[in-house]
Each structure stands twice: as C-alpha cells, then as structure tokens.
Amino acid sequence: MALVDPDIFNKDPREHYDLLQRLGGGTYGEVFKARDKVSKDLVALKMVKMEPDDDVATLQKEILMLKTCRHANIVAYHGSYLWLQKLWICMEFCGAGSLQDIYQVTGSLSELQISYVCREVLQGLAYLHSEKKIHRDIKGANILINDCGEVKLADFGISAQIGATLARRLSFIGTPYWMAPEVAAVALKGGYNELCDIWSLGITAIELAELQPPLFDVHPLRVLFLMTKSGYQPPRLKEKSRWSSSFHNFVKVTLTKNSKKRPSATKMLSHQLVSQPGLNRGLILDLLDKMKNPGKGLPVDIEDEEPEPPPAIPRRIRSTYRASSLGIPDADCCRRQMEFQRPRCVDCRPQAETVRLYPPAHFGSTSPRSQLSDSDDDYDDVDIPAPSENIPPPLPPKPKFRSPSDDGSGGIRDDGQLSPGVLVRCASGPPPRTPRPGPPPATCSPHLTARSDPSLWNPAAPEPGQPPLVPPRKEKMRGKMENEKRREKYPLLVKLFNGCPLQIHSTAAWTHPSTKDQNLLLGAEEGIFILNRNDQEATLEMIFPGRTTWLYCINNLLMSLSGKTPYLYSHSILGLLERKDGRTGSPIAHISPHRLLARKNMVSSKIQDTKGCRACCVAESASSGGPFLCGALETSVVLLQWYQPMNKFLLVRQVLFPLPTPLPVFTLLTTPGSELPAVCIGVSPGQAAKSVLFHTVRFGALSCWLDDSSTEHKGPVQVIQVKEDMVMVLMDGSLKLVTPEGAPAPGLRTPEIPMTEAVEAVAMVEDRLEAFWKHGVQVWAPGLKQPLQELRDPTLTFRLLCSPRPVVVETRPTDDPTAPSNLYIQE
C-alpha cells in the first residue's frame, strides 16, 4: 500500500509511545493516553479499526490536512501510524476530558461558562472556515478541555471521512441530534456549507445547559424525519426564566432554519453573549474544581419524587431452609419435605435447594442412576417412597444411589397400584458435571399432585357393577401416544427460594456476560432484588430501592417501572452490581439514586416525561428491528423502540388518549407487514368470523378505539401474543387462540379451550399452554379439549409471576396468605 506522506508511518506506534491508559471507545475505535518515549510528553492515541476494502488513500489525504491546522482552539496533530489494519492518530492530550464527561459529573454549566465555551469554539470555527474546512461534528463530546482550562475542538475532518468509508459496514453512522436541517435533507435539497457548524454550536449550547440535546429521547430516524418536514420549528431553551435574554437570542440566531440567513462564525463573535467582559479561563478552572469535588453544589432535580421510606426488610435475604437435626419427623412434615424440600439426612449441608416433582415411573422400571458408583455420594438423587398415613416414616438413611426396586419407592404396591415417587436432591456440593437423566416417562394419568395423593396418580378404578372400559381404537392410540410424548416434555418446577418475604410484582432473567451466571431479577414492593441461581446458597440481594411493579431486561440493561410516583427507569445491571458490591456491610440509602453518585457514574436514570406511568409492555418484531416498549401514561400512550447503536430505548410515537380506569389489559400486538404495533387496552366477545374484538390504540395512523368499553368479564382477562399470527386470550373462563385480527387461529381443531378451573393466568411455553389457578397448574396442548397434566395442591396457593422466559411461580400456604412465599422456576 503506497503512502502519500512520510509522516504516516507503517510501523507499530508502541515503538514510539508507551500506552498508559484506555480513555474511552466509540463506533470507530478506542482512545488511549500515552507517553512519548523520548520527550516524555503526554499524547492521545486514537486507534481506528480498518477493513481491507476501506479507502485508506482518502483517509490519508484527510490526515494530511490536519497538519495545516494550527490554532489555539484546535487539538494539535502529531502524526499517524498504519499497522495491522489499524490506523493510529497521535493528537494533543487534553487531561480534563470532554465537556460531556465534565457535565455528567458537575451538572449543567453556568451561563458564563457556556458563554466562554461558545466564544472559544467560535474562534476555532472561524479559523477552520477561513481555511475552507468544515468540522461537521460539533458537540459536547468533541470539545475537549486541557488541565489549563483551554477549550479545544477535536475530531476535525477525520471523523467525517471515516464515517464515509465505514458506511458500507454500518447501517446508520452517528446521530442527527446536532445535525443541521440542510444536512439531514441533503438528499432532497443538495449540499451544505460551513454554516452547518453554527447550527451544531447552537444545539451544543442547549446541551451544556440542559445536559442533553433537544429530542435526545426520540429515535434518530424520527428526528431526521422531523427535521425534513416543512413545519419543523428549531428548538429553544426549555426554562425561559433561568437564562438571560442574551442567551435565548444566541440560541435563536444560531438555530436559524434557513442556512442562507444563518450568520457566520466571524459575525457570531460579535454577539452580546460571547463578547461580554469577564469571560476567561478561570470560569473553566472553577468547573474543573467542581468536577474533582462533585459534592460541592451538586444540583438537585426539582422534579424528584419524595424520598423512599427506609426498607422494612434487610437488603440481603437468605433462603430460610436449613438441614434439620437428626430425628424422626411426623408424617405431615415428611410429606411436606417430599413435596418441595430435601429429606432430613445426616450429610445434608445448607445449600440452594433443587427440588423436582416427577410423574410416577413406569411399571417395573428401575432408576437409571442405580448403576453409578458410590463415589458420587455427595451428589445423590434419592428416591423416597410416599409415606403411609398410618405408619410413621423410618429414619432416612445416608443418601445412596438406589433403585426403586431396592427401597420400595417405585414399582407395584400390595394393592396393585403404582406407588408414586418424588425425586429430591440432597447435595452438599455443586451438581455433577455428567448430564442428569431426564424425568421418568409419565403414566397415562393426566394428574400430578404436589401432595403425592395416590388417587391422583392413576386412572380411577371402575365402580362396582359397571362393565369394563372398551379398548381404544387403533386410530385413537396414535393420538394417545402423542399425548404421552407431550407429557414427557413437561418441564418440572424447581425450587429457587424458600421463605421469601417480598411482595413480588414482576421478574426477569439475566445472564452475566462474564461469569455466565444465570440470575433472576425480582421487582417487588420493597425494591429490585437479584438471585444468582449458580450460588451455593440461595440469597436475595437488593440492587435498587423503591417500589417496582414491572421489569424487562435487554443487553445488560434493565428497564423498570419504579418509585413511589412511578417513572420508567433505565438501569445498567453491571453498574447496579458494582454499586452493591461496593456497599457491602452498609444498607442502601433511601434517597433518590442520582443523589448518591456523581452524574458520570449514574447507573439508574429516569426516562423523561414518564411520570405517573401506569403500565408497560414489550413486543418484539422481526420486521421492524429492535423490540418496542409501550407505556401507559396519565393522558397519553408512548411507544419507544430499542436503538442498538445507543443501547437505549428511544421515543417513536406519542398519542394523546384517555385510557380507561382500571386498565384490565395493556399489551402490544404486532401484525405481519405493519411498521408499528398497536396496543390492546381491552377485549370483548365477537361474532363467528371474529371470535374476539380487540380494543386497540394504533400509532401508525389515527388512534383507533373500538368503543365497547362497557364489557364486563367474569374473571381475569389476559392477552398474550405467542406468535406473529397467534394471540392467546383468556376471557370469561375460556382460553381462545385467535389471529391478531381476532379470527380463530387456523390449523387448530379446537381454537377455544374451556377451562375446568377458575384460571387466573396463562402462559405459552414452547408448544404447551399452562393455565394457573388458585391451587395448581394445568398443562394443555393447543387444539385439545383435555389437559395433558395437572399439578394441584389445595394446601397451597399458586401465582404466576413471569412467563415465558422463564416461568416463575410463587406459592403460599392456603391457610396463611401473608406467610413468606416459596419461588419455583421451570427448567
């Protein structure tokens, strides 16, 4: 590859510089703090990742242009290196960082500080424009401050050209929040000139005053669309009384929509805001001192809600189950252990419980683990027989691999019926690495009871005097065998936690990106808690205080509906964990999170204009890119979409609409070919062609409300879209499978399933329907009129907390609804 300038070296820059520290990274690469090995001067090395087909020659020409830029307000260029498909650009080092880094710690700048920054930037722009150069990327992140308080423009020239060369690899380069309207409409109106930098400076002035540019919570593509509309109005400062008339006028003049009427940088230097006396580096030095001591004068958000009351429970909660002392328990206690807990055995040491409720084994079957050696005694799975009601249970022996034929836990009883068995893990260490055998095949009985009632394990015997049942026909046997296969796939409930005192509203699953530990996040009345499923001892740890009613996890980011006055929040999960680990031994303070940390280190932030949010829902659409998030506000409905380059949800639409109270349903529905989803806020019975009528608010065109709000339902109402062309509707004691338009779902023999119990919630797990009612759960196959399996226990109340990833169930004693709960998960 031919080089066009001897200053661009084909060698490793680390031969000349010692890399000291990584300062940050972005779309194009990383920036490092380095020291010259000869002069010992500090420099900044920007490493840009290249591709073999990138236009390196054009990049080199742009780099050569940087050599000619010599100005006090422009970061000096020292040279470049091209090594191993990476372009290294050596620039002047500015130790205080960018203005964006600074205001994230200090809060908004004062008007005098903003005036000084704008004057220095205008001086740099006036020089660039006189040299026929355009910066193209003026914003807070590209305005650097050195330790002396001097203001420097960075990323000149090279960023624009890099963006052009990398456009083949990235669908959307940069963000349009600082972009001038003529740049956004370049495809429609032609080119632009250096005055686009003046517009960007006006947006930057608003950014320094309000900590973000206008429309920053709106999706970038929507911002581009808005700026190209003829009725687009330039933004203004929000708080009129806080800023002087001179500042308001400066923003107005720089944000002149017609670029031909927009003043030049030289003319703007005579504006009253930047020509006033008293603008000197001391203003920035005061700002740097405030950054080094963020506790001084940290601004308080006047819209903050009242402080949360101190939590009534500890921030670390351990599972209450412990291995009991050696003894012979009574029959009821032993039966309870067989249901959900480990047996009382000598070698059991405290550890997170794993309990499986298995259907009974086939006649004459033996345990697949009976052939294993005794060397794995620490990880035994023990088959325990159901106790007789009249005979006290014997003292449990030391756990040992035994087959049902050895200990009587399976096989034929004296009365000819199969005896049930419950497999209970009793482990003193981590589970074995060898794969565990699957659950034993189910019998033909559809019932599985948590109380191990033998009458529910097997088909009922015919009453005396009745003829025997006629054998099924061959054509029916095939369907029966398919049902048996479905039963074998039924995922069993595994206990996660015993004795949970929280009032849980929502859950979400999250996998740690480094350790790969599987975690369960709980949104409760007391706050947000995390449970590491890989820990030896089950422990709930608070990571965010305050009432939380809804959770959603995406890309190590947690969205929540939290607070005494509910707001939609965005949390960095890794940041929450780091803050928790740094506070070991001291409780989390019951004040707003942003008052605890400097702004740069904030891990939790409110989504603007979501005060009083009543409900949230999420829908994923393959045709539209990232998932959609919808929020029900007091007088409107907002729709946000995930934007991967910024790793956040951004506003797409907001519809003013008076939502009903109460709000029984709030679910997003997507249809094939539609750009935006609709939000369902109610359902009602339909006619034959449309068995369900969805009451929806649509975002694409005019809002649509199917006016049948007076419908009263018998029992709970639930709407879940399980596939792109199938919606599951629980209404009036039956479960209907319909299309997003409300018509019966095609390909099903029975699109409506009448529930045999008072079902409170439903979930679709793979190809199974799971219906949860007060004392158990039924498992159905779509299109069948009879449940495949059933788990029931009248002594417990069941509540579905989350589905479908994963299904989390909470149980409490029926006779004590306020008792601590047990938490289960489906594998």
UniProtKB/Swiss-Prot annotation:
InterPro entries recorded: CNH_dom, Kinase-like_dom_sf, MAPKKKK, Prot_kinase_dom, Protein_kinase_ATP_BS, STE20/SPS1-PAK
Phosphoserine: residues bearing it: 171, 373, 375, 403, 405, 419, 592
Keyword terms of this UniProt record: ATP-binding, Kinase, Nucleotide-binding, Phosphoprotein, Serine/threonine-protein kinase, Transferase, Ubl conjugation
Tissue: Expressed in hemopoietic cells (at protein level). Ubiquitously expressed in all tissues examined at embryonic stage 16.5 dpc with high levels in lung, heart and fetal liver. In the neonate, expression is restricted to the tissues which undergo lineage decisions, lung, thymus, liver, kidney and brain. In the adult, expression is limited to hemopoietic organs, thymus, bone marrow, and spleen and to the testis.
PTM summary: Autophosphorylates: phosphorylation promotes ubiquitination by the Cul7-RING(FBXW8) ubiquitin-protein ligase complex, leading to its degradation by the proteasome.
Catalyzed reactions per annotation: L-seryl-[protein] + ATP = O-phospho-L-seryl-[protein] + ADP + H(+); L-threonyl-[protein] + ATP = O-phospho-L-threonyl-[protein] + ADP + H(+)
Start-end of Basic and acidic residues biased regions: 472-485
Pfam families according to UniProt: CNH, Pkinase
Superkingdom of origin: Eukaryota
Subunit structure: Interacts with MAP3K1. Interacts with FBXW8. Interacts with CLNK (via its SH2 domain).
Primary role: Serine/threonine-protein kinase, which plays a role in the response to environmental stress. Appears to act upstream of the JUN N-terminal pathway. Activator of the Hippo signaling pathway which plays a pivotal role in organ size control and tumor suppression by restricting proliferation and promoting apoptosis. MAP4Ks act in parallel to and are partially redundant with STK3/MST2 and STK4/MST2 in the phosphorylation and activation of LATS1/2, and establish MAP4Ks as components of the expanded Hippo pathway. May play a role in hematopoietic lineage decisions and growth regulation.
Entry's family note: Belongs to the protein kinase superfamily. STE Ser/Thr protein kinase family. STE20 subfamily.
Annotated protein name in UniProt: Mitogen-activated protein kinase kinase kinase kinase 1
Protein species of origin: Mus musculus (Mouse)
